[in-house]
Amino acid sequence: MKKIVWLLAAFLLIAVSQLSGQVQKTIQLPPPQTEIGKPLMQVLKLRQSSRDFDSKALPLQELSNLLWAANGINRAETGKRTAPSAMNWQEVDIYVVMKEGAYLYDAQDHRLSLVSMKDLREATGRQAFTKEAPVNLVYVSDRAKMSGASDDDKTMWGAADVGFIAQNVYLYCASQGLAVVVRGMVDREALTSALKLRPEQKIILAQTIGYPK
């Protein structure tokens, strides 16, 4: 009898450990804390790029605040965002690349949807810190959403709209004491494949976020 009990206990322990090790396909983010932070002028004074990151993971609440600040919905009645976009195309997708996998940020439902179970952080940049920092954001411009625009305009406005989002992230990180740097050196071929991007989706920039070392 004792042997049976022991075997059952061992089985349950293994089952629980396997479940806990599974990557979540959907992560519902908590509501953003919109009442926190430093005054704007102080944040502008503190804004800077950093390349020294601690590997400590960001809490889910911090990630929620960060993504909402980046390009979340701040006017529920219209679905408009914290960052402007040309013609209100809202063509920029944010992919959140972490040790646990790569996720697509869904601003409408303020949640993350799993895209890849692999740790793709190293592909987000050539610098060594990209694979140590807990979060790398990859900004993708979906040209299919930019109806009526020429190829040149799609390139220009896609880059501009990503720039607005990246600056929002810079300001949030300055307010919260996080280290951050935006980068153009990205392994676009590897990420395009791993993130299952369509030909119309173009990687513009990546941005690394974490605690300062």
Task: Please report, for each region that a protein language model flagged, where it lies by residue.
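Bacterial N-terminal signal peptides
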Residues: 7-16
